[in-house]
Amino acid sequence: MKLELGNFYVEEIVFGEKTSFKDGVLTINKQEALDYVMEDENITHAELHIVKPGDMVRLCPVKEAIEPRIKLDGRTYFPGVTDEELTRCGEGRTHALKGCSVLVVGKHWGGFQDGLIDMGGEGAKYTYYSTLKNIVLVGDTNEDFEKNEQQKKNKALRWAGHKLAEYIGKTVKDMEPQEVETYELEPVTQRSEEVTKLPGVVFVMQPQSQMEELGYNDMVYGWDMNRMVPTYMHPNEVLDGAIISGSFMPCSSKWSTYDFQNFPALKRLYAEHGKTVNFLGVIMSNLNVALQQKQRSALFVAQMAKSLGAQGAIVAEEGYGNPDADFIACIVALENEGIKTVGLTNECTGRDGFSQPLVTLDEKANAIVSCGNVSELVELPPMPVVLGELEALARDGLSGGWAGDEILGSSVKADGSVIMENNAMFCGDQVVGWSTKTMKEF
């Protein structure tokens, strides 16, 4: 399978008369874009903003991030989501607007799964999305049934973000890209001797799938991942719209759709393929809640890795707590097959850093890369501009915020300053591979 990714680098985003891209400038007709978003009768309010790195702007509650892209052959970019037609991702030519994203923010209501981004100041270092130029869709919906729920599906706003990203991506459909990245893996059984003599490595992905009720979990080709067993996938599918992010995981642990589209760990394995490793592909697992479901997934993962001839594996989980059991079970099952395995995850060691980092551990899980502590307290000064509603951080049960604490008070102070756990930083731990955090020993 061969994917060509044509990249257009965005130097500036402005509002203007015609939605277009020229000489590094992305111009958006705001009214036309809003009219397109408002075609969904569930959207009751929508506004667009542009923010760039260094802007003293705080965004909350942030729900999703998507890179604007378009398929040149006319196929929908997110099959099963933005169109019911199912077509295969990961092949042909896709054009992408690089250095920018569409961010989806609630006008008022947040929830456990939503987060915060500071584009400038002290808080900017905590999230990758402060380094991007962002088109911010701030919206509200008629989904009254969940407005006061701590856990929200956020379907209308998330779908609006995906459609808007495709709408903006159309600006470069018929243009010549500044560069073309090519992603191609030969069939596993048809590789050269030079490649097959290298250590075979699989990448095991564990996207969020904990919720038994449909609509909260990550989706693959529009299918809720709670309803699947581990599956072999081509990495190109992941990088090209097959998976969208869900609306459940504490936000610093979240893998946004933008993360799936640009997954740095996958791209690094591609870069090493044929040089230091024989990249065998992706085993797409899950993170279901019942013990038997976890055991079944571990059995599937280990069997597939062994059948593919893997000598090494990387396991990455989207989340912590209950999913730690899946994470460790997969590592142990792989190690039991003689497959050397490295884990990628964050940890929950408490605000003092002294608690056990994962819910369950095993001596065979002896090579784990930590991407952060979800419980670490973060204090941020007031911001002059807030897009969305900052009070949502305290009022609506965001995973790193609280309405009251006998010592710390509310997460949101009267002057607009914030104290919260890292949990609420949008995609803050970046398990996908571009975390800038380091660890120190004392």
Swiss-Prot record:
InterPro entries: Gly/sarc/bet_Rdtase_B_asu/bsu (IPR016585), Gly_reductase_pB_sua/b (IPR015417). One of its GO terms (molecular function) is betaine reductase activity. It holds the Pfam family Gly_reductase. It catalyses: acetyl phosphate + trimethylamine + [thioredoxin]-disulfide + H2O = glycine betaine + [thioredoxin]-dithiol + phosphate + H(+). Its EC number is 1.21.4.4. Keywords: Oxidoreductase. The keyword Oxidoreductase applies. It is an enzyme of class 1 (oxidoreductase). It comes from the Bacteria. In the first step of betaine reductase, the substrate is bound to component PB via a Schiff base intermediate. Then the PB-activated substrate is nucleophilically attacked by the selenol anion of component PA to transform it to a carboxymethylated selenoether and the respective amine. By action of component PC, acetyl phosphate is formed, leaving component PA in its oxidized state. Finally component PA becomes reduced by the thioredoxin system to start a new catalytic cycle of reductive deamination. Heterotetramer of two alpha and two beta subunits. Component of the betaine reductase complex, together with components A and C. PB is substrate specific. This is Betaine reductase complex component B subunit alpha. It comes from Peptoclostridium acidaminophilum. The gene is grdI.
